[in-house]
């Protein structure tokens, strides 16, 4: 027989179920700790530990003066392939983070993306991705993206200087790099993006990341590595993103490949 869960866990599970079924809606406050103690739900320490567990699981936010409140919004959709649709940024002005907001039915302002641009020495990972010696000069465009006042993620793109020198990509003005963003800048410079490789993994955040992204205690981040190439294989961007784990739902919609069919087509040519 499995051991009985501690009382704080039982209390946390009960509130979690009530949140999921809508008994407590987004923005609604859970009972005060002292009220639950008086109602016989456990000691102050028990109730506080239950609420901290709910916060760690991303269901509530705890703050002085506001108590324990159910998180207001569902995670943002982070589109996989669709966010890079050329028609969005080449022919329009829907850069990747805006495409995510549109898909999520959420509002946005261009200045919710801020950035700093600097010329730095390439780390081993950056140098390998861009095909440069370690320590070579590269441009780093570091962005912090927010939804309203809440940070959602950081994204730092690295470029060879000869690809972006004198372009809007090295302009630190808040918001995307002009109409269509960085991919449109590369397109106009003769570096049309053709294919990408993305790698994602979850990890524990650093103390600095937890503070910058305003993470709940125990919340993990999802790190993204994106390598962007032209049709001839030239790497024109290597990017590292750090996303608040509970603020995104990663969404992919793609045609299922059939390598046997592709090989047959190649042989018939």
From Swiss-Prot:
> What InterPro entries does its record include?
Bact_HTH_transcr_reg, Chorismate_lyase_/UTRA_dom_sf, Tscrpt_reg_HTH_GntR, UTRA, WH-like_DNA-bd_sf, WH_DNA-bd_sf
- State the disulfide connectivity: none
Q: Which residues bind DNA?
A: 33-52
Decide whether keyword DNA-binding is in the record: yes
Q: What is the protein's known function?
A: The imp locus inhibits the extrachromosomal maintenance of the Streptomyces plasmid SLP1.
Against PANTHER family, the record matches this protein to:
GNTR-FAMILY TRANSCRIPTIONAL REGULATOR, MANNOSYL-D-GLYCERATE TRANSPORT/METABOLISM SYSTEM REPRESSOR MNGR-RELATED
Gene3D superfamilies attached here? Chorismate lyase-like (3.40.1410.10), Winged helix-like DNA-binding domain superfamily/Winged helix DNA-binding domain (1.10.10.10)
Q: Which Pfam families match?
A: GntR, UTRA
Q: Tell me, which GO biological process terms does this entry list?
A: negative regulation of DNA-templated transcription
Please, which domain of life does this record's source organism belong to? Bacteria
Which intervals hold domain HTH gntR-type? 5-73
The protein's matches in CDD domains, at most eight in alphabetical order, are given as: WHTH_GntR
Transcription regulation recorded as keyword:
yes
**What keywords is this UniProt entry annotated with?**
DNA-binding, Transcription, Transcription regulation
Record the organism. Answer: Streptomyces coelicolor (strain ATCC BAA-471 / A3(2) / M145)
What protein name does the entry list? Uncharacterized HTH-type transcriptional regulator SCO4628
Molecular function (GO) terms for this protein are:
DNA binding; DNA-binding transcription factor activity
């Amino acid at each position: 027989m499995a051991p009985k869960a501690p009382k704080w866990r039982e209390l946390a599970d009960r509130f979690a179920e009530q949140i999921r079924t809508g008994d407590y809606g987004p923005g609604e406050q859970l009972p005060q700790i002292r009220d639950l103690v008086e109602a016989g739900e456990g000691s102050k320490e028990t109730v506080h530990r239950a609420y901290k567990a709910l916060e760690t699981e991303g269901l509530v936010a705890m703050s002085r003066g506001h108590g324990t409140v159910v998180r207001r919004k569902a995670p943002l959709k982070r589109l996989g392939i669709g966010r890079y649709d050329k028609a969005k940024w080449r022919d329009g002005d829907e850069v990747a983070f805006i495409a995510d907001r549109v898909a999520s039915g959420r509002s946005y302002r261009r200045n919710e993306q801020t950035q700093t641009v600097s010329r730095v020495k390439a780390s081993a990972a950056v140098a390998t991705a861009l095909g440069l010696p370690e320590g070579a000069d590269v441009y780093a465009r570091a962005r912090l993206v927010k939804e309203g006042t809440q940070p959602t993620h950081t994204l730092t793109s690295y470029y060879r200087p000869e690809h972006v020198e004198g372009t809007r990509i090295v302009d630190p003005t808040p918001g995307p790099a002009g109409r269509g963003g960085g991919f449109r800048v590369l397109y106009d410079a003769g570096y049309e993006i053709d294919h990408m490789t993305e790698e994602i993994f979850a990890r524990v955040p650093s103390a600095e990341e937890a503070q910058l992204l305003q993470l709940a205690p125990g919340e993990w981040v999802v790190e993204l590595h994106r390598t962007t190439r032209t049709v001839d294989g030239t790497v024109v961007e290597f990017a590292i993103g750090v996303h608040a784990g509970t603020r995104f739902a990663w969404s992919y919609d793609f045609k299922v490949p059939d390598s046997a069919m592709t090989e047959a087509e190649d042989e018939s040519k």
